[in-house]
Amino acid sequence: MAVTASMVKELREATGAGMMDCKKALAETDGNMEEAIEFLRKKGMAGADKKAGRTAAEGVIAIAVSDDKKKAAIVEVNCETDFVAKGDDFKAFADEIAAIVLATGTVDVDALMNEKMANGQTIDEKRREMIGKIGENMAVRRVELVESNGTIGKYQHGEKIGVVVAMNGGDDALVRDVAMHVAAANPSAISADDVDQEMLEKERKFQIEQAQDSGKPAEIIEKMIDGRMRKYLQEITLLGQAFVKDPDQTVEKLLKASDASVSNFVRLEVGEGIEIEETNFADEVAAAAAAVKG
């Protein structure tokens, strides 16, 4: 039986599945609507698109490192609740995605969704299946691949913060210590030379406004601004920060003592930058009542 647009529309409305999934289901079941619905249910596709608009700000950070420690993949996979994020199935899903990124080098999220998992499903098919099974929206949000001519180390604070550091020189213990420091101190850049100029200009403008309010002479104000900017750069750069395990020395001194240097780092924290719409209880009750009436 030929699959028509109206049949696809009817199936989408009944299941909330995507257009292409509905078309495939109808083709597989020779246009039988009930069998197509069951096909989608078994595949976990029903309802996935309906849940796609819901905010997924919980989740995990997963990291995969190559055996030679020359390459690492770090990914953020989101869900809606911490309860689901702590589940073994969800963590295994995220871990396999990180392993796929490491193996394929695919860092574009849309392209990554089409990569195959060990069971033959694409990542997106597995994601939809899990949405149907668990009932929460899920998304692969961020993907990074880090490579090094030296060595790579990682550090994870639970599953909520993950760090990958590329280092030249030093040993495994040092690169892990630096990764742990990045997790705790959250530097914006490696050194002052790497800091975004727009960020610097914004901070300098703020410091100028603050200093001018002091009413001090111009030459004193200039020195105040220079001093505050030096302190600011120390606070936001990896090399300028005091090492978390030994605040008496900077990370720069720690690295120099081992003739080591950091060429790159990536720090991901679950949910950072995601805006969560806050709804009070009264609003939730009103919305639920309206839905029942509708």
Curated annotation (Swiss-Prot):
Region listing for Involved in Mg(2+) ion dislocation from EF-Tu, in residue ranges: 81-84
Alphabetized InterPro entries for the sequence: EF-Ts_dimer_sf, Transl_elong_EFTs/EF1B, Transl_elong_EFTs/EF1B_dimer, Transl_elong_Ts_CS, UBA-like_sf
Cited Pfam families: EF_TS
User: Could you tell me where this protein is found in the cell?
Assistant: Cytoplasm
Looking up Gene3D superfamilies in the UniProt record yields: 1.10.286.20, DNA helicase RuvA subunit, C-terminal domain, Elongation factor Ts, dimerisation domain
Q: Which UniProt keywords apply?
A: Cytoplasm, Elongation factor, Protein biosynthesis
Please provide, alphabetically and separated by semicolons, the GO molecular function terms listed in this UniProt record: translation elongation factor activity
The record's Gene Ontology cellular component field reads: cytoplasm
> So what family is this one in?
Belongs to the EF-Ts family.
Q: Which HAMAP family does the entry link to?
A: EF_Ts
Q: What does this protein do?
A: Associates with the EF-Tu.GDP complex and induces the exchange of GDP to GTP. It remains bound to the aminoacyl-tRNA.EF-Tu.GTP complex up to the GTP hydrolysis stage on the ribosome.
**This protein is called what?**
Elongation factor Ts
Native source species: Hydrogenovibrio crunogenus (strain DSM 25203 / XCL-2)
